[in-house]
Amino acid sequence: MMLKPSIDTLLDKVPSKYSLVILQAKRAHELEAGAAPTQSFKSVKSTLQALEEIESGNVVIHPDPAAKRAAIRARIEAERLAREEEERKIKEQIAKEKEEEGEKI
C-alpha cells in the first residue's frame, strides 16, 4: 500500500527525516489541541493531517529559532499591554460610575 504523501515529497520540504518527524509530531499535537487547520484534509488522523499540511507547504520549520522566539515574545508583550489597557479602561469606567453615584446622593 502506497502512503500519501510520499516520504520523498515530504523530504523535499524539510532538511532531514528527523526534522520531518519532529515537525509532524508538533503539528499533530497542535491539531489535537484544537489548532485551526490550514486546509481541508483527506485523512482523519491528526498525524496524517500534519503530513498533508507539510506536503502542501502550509507548515514549515522556522528558519531562525531566535527570530521565532522574539516574535513570540513580542506577541505576548502586545497581549499583556492590551490586557492592561482594557483593565485601565474598566477601572476608569468604575471610577466614573462611582463619581456619578456620589453626585446623585
Swiss-Prot record:
High-level lineage: Bacteria, Bacillati, Bacillota, Bacilli, Lactobacillales
Its job: Promotes RNA polymerase assembly. Latches the N- and C-terminal regions of the beta' subunit thereby facilitating its interaction with the beta and alpha subunits.
Complexes and interactors: The RNAP catalytic core consists of 2 alpha, 1 beta, 1 beta' and 1 omega subunit. When a sigma factor is associated with the core the holoenzyme is formed, which can initiate transcription.
Top-level taxon in the UniProt lineage: Bacteria
Family: Belongs to the RNA polymerase subunit omega family.
Any one GO BP annotation for this protein: DNA-templated transcription
EC number, UniProt record: 2.7.7.6
Top-level EC class: transferase
Protein name, entry field: DNA-directed RNA polymerase subunit omega
One cellular component (GO) term of this entry: DNA-directed RNA polymerase complex
GO MF, any single term: DNA binding
Keyword set, alphabetical order: DNA-directed RNA polymerase, Nucleotidyltransferase, Transcription, Transferase
Catalytic activity: RNA(n) + a ribonucleoside 5'-triphosphate = RNA(n+1) + diphosphate
InterPro entries listed in its UniProt record: DNA-dir_RNA_pol_omega, Pol_omega/Rpo6/RPB6, RPB6/omega-like_sf
Pfam families (alphabetical): RNA_pol_Rpb6
